[in-house]
Amino acid sequence: APAKLLASGCGDLIANVIAVKDWQLGHKKKKEYYGRYAADLALMSAEIVMENSSEFAKKGLDSRVIVEGLISAGVASCIAGSSRPCSGAEHLVSHALDKLAPGIGLHGEKCGLGSIMMAKLQGQDWKKIVKTLKNVGAPTTAKQIGLKPDVIIKALMIAQDLRPERYTILKEIKMTEKRAL
């Protein structure tokens, strides 16, 4: 598979770190079902990429490892009965970007960007996500995939409205233009 598509797959996998944290938040705040096995499987899928990203940077992306991670993430969603283990606020940002700038950037690239921003909001190690994405050759800025800053700001402001029933970190804050900056 082309390196760009594999890197995009890595962005989609890294998103699981954000999604699981959002799922835990939904469980805590809304008593939403939370399945530890599905969550752990989704996290393992992300961690395989994160732990091997330095190796990928040296030797190139290992398509088998990435595809296995994506399959495991899909299994985690099947076990959970929803996309919750693999789709949180970072995917809402990706979907908002799809709506505002259709056809620009690959799904996993936008999930990777969303993961950086949402990790910062969640208090997670966003710099580790940036490093991992760089190591696998995925974009870490909007400019790298052809998105303008105003589109990112608008996406952050509308993201939670796309799935109001899904509790994410975006429900915890009032996303304004000033905050999005």
Language-model segments: residues:
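Carboxylate- and glycine-rich phosphate/diphosphate-binding segment that chelates Mg2+/Mn2+
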Residues: 1-84
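Alpha-helix initiation and N-capping motif
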Residues: 7, 46, 63, 90, ...
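C-terminal charged capping/lid subdomain of soluble metabolic enzymes
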Residues: 13, 123-181
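Short, hydrophobic/amphipathic alpha-helical patches that form generic packing surfaces
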Residues: 16, 71-78, 112-121, 158-161
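Short helix-capping/linker segments at secondary-structure and domain boundaries
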Residues: 18-26, 81-84, 103, 121-127, ...
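Short coil/turn segments at secondary-structure boundaries
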Residues: 28-29, 61-68, 87, 144-148, ...
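Amphipathic alpha-helical segments within well-ordered protein domains
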Residues: 50, 54, 94, 98, ...
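C-terminal catalytic subdomain
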Residues: 87-124
